[in-house]
Amino acid sequence: MFSKILVPVVGSQADDEAIKLACTLAKRVKDKEKENGKIWAVSVVAIKRALPLDAEIDSEIKKAEDLLNHVQSIAEEEEFEIETDVLQAREVGPAIVDEAVERGVHLILMGITYKKQFGQFSLGNVVPYVLKNSPCPVILYQQ
């Protein structure tokens, strides 16, 4: 069972559904064990190489915090408490994988949107990186 779930969020409608699904999965753990599972929602702010890694990019951090407040309110509607965190990194994919390793999660649940690049469906760079390097199962929720 997935008692520790990491949900990276980017601000799409799929994030809302991914958080709801994560809450449902984490609540199922309570049936088997005495307490709910744990969910971490993270938003990764990509820092350009020209800037120091700990650079304060107020507008980007504010957007990430607003996004995390939004997903936290969705979790509250589902009667579930989640932890949120803003991560700053050069690359989004490695930051997600590192966070999964650090927290010892059992599942990464990512909401994705249907994107076309050059007329074909594209997952971008982040999702394939996470799928290839994740230490745990990954569920993609397509909106």
Please give the residue ranges for each predicted region.
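Structural beta-alpha unit
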Residues: 77-108
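Solvent-exposed polar/charged
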Residues: 24-27, 101, 132
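Short glycine-rich, flexible loops that bind phosphorylated cofactors or substrates
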Residues: 14, 92, 116-118
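Short secondary-structure boundary segments
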Residues: 43-45, 111-113, 143
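Short, flexible loop segments at boundaries between secondary-structure elements
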Residues: 133-143
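Short, solvent-exposed amphipathic alpha-helices that sit
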Residues: 21, 60-71, 95-97
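Small/aliphatic-rich secondary-structure junction motif
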Residues: 1-55, 74-78, 83
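Glycine-rich, Arg-bearing micro-motifs that act as flexible, cationic patches
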Residues: 110-132
